[in-house]
Amino acid sequence: MRTIALLIIIAVMLVPALAAEEEKIAITDEEGRNVTVPFNPSSIICLSPGAAEVIYALGESDRIIAVTDDCDMPPALLEKESIGKSSRNADLERIIELNPDLVIAKTGGLFPVEDEQKLTDYGIPVLRYRLLHINALIPMIEDLGRILGEEEDARDMANDISGYYDSILDRTGTMPDEDRPSVYFMSMGHFDWTGNRDSTGHVRIAEAGGKNIAADLQTKVPHVDMEWVIEEDPEVIVYSMTSEQYDGTTPTIEEMEAKRMEIISLPGFESIDAVKTGRVYITDIKMSSGLSEMAAMLYYAKWLHPDLFQDIDPRAVHGELLQKYLNMDIEDIYQVYPDAPVKSEG
């Protein structure tokens, strides 16, 4: 009898331990690392704006206990405790003090490896996502759905994004080079920074049906001479405006218009086809991360091929995504200039 009672006691004691073991989930993050994280974590610190946005969109923002200052979409996230300006300079001591179940950071050097090691030494798991393209956004949505127990909502969100994404690829996937306009992409708030074929900027241009004039340059983010740009004579110019270049959470039309005029007025640029035809566009760098990346892709497609995408209204899609997932009204939000309206019927 005593033996049976002892076995029952041991079994009861083991149940919580076994349950704890079951409350783990293996995730392959954007860097391809297999990380074991808690299932259904109650406390998350986000150093990745796109991840914070998707967690909010899944209705689970209460789990987020702190964010970096660049996690500002939607702005409601800024009500969380600030843990630093960005993942590169996050307050590690405070993170360790808060002892979250999970930290989600950016990829590569944007969150130093030694910083991650300090957290994992304290038993805090770290996932990494930067989400500069749809092919990173959709897997992360699915990952967060699994982690948070919101797989159905995550699947619906991923399907929404995939539907818009496929509507682009179906039209541009087999497009011959002669039908693709040449594009110069001004990266990260610099006139002379761009991206070669290994960059996400190149992928965005190619998938939208364009030709990146910097595709064959040697470095991933080459710094080029403006004379070279003039000689290449791109048909379209797209400039990525950084958050340091405007005052609010998103830029104003006036701020983007001023930047566009600055580009058009660069010495010698009056001879470039993109300037002569008015195909110079400004985007907010925040459009290249999170759910807004899908709207950015639609804008690119519409800018490069207005006739092919005349049935698509990128701003309307952007508004639908903001309203449906972030409870935001697009009315006063402008992250591209000029817009790409749908052609009127008749």
Task: Show which residues each predicted segment covers.
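Short helix-initiation/N-cap motifs at beta->coil->alpha
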Residues: 30-32, 81-93, 132, 217-226
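Alpha-helical, coiled-coil/dimerization segments enriched in small aliphatic residues
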Residues: 70-72, 194-220
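A short, structured surface patch at a secondary-structure boundary
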Residues: 43-98, 102-110
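Extracytoplasmic substrate-binding proteins
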Residues: 23-27, 34-36, 43, 113-193, ...
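Secretory targeting signatures
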Residues: 1-21
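A local structural motif
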Residues: 35-40, 75-82, 207-218
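Flexible, solvent-exposed loop/hinge segments that line or gate ligand/substrate-binding clefts
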Residues: 233-279
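Short helices/loops that flank or line small-molecule/ion binding pockets
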Residues: 91-99, 122, 224-233
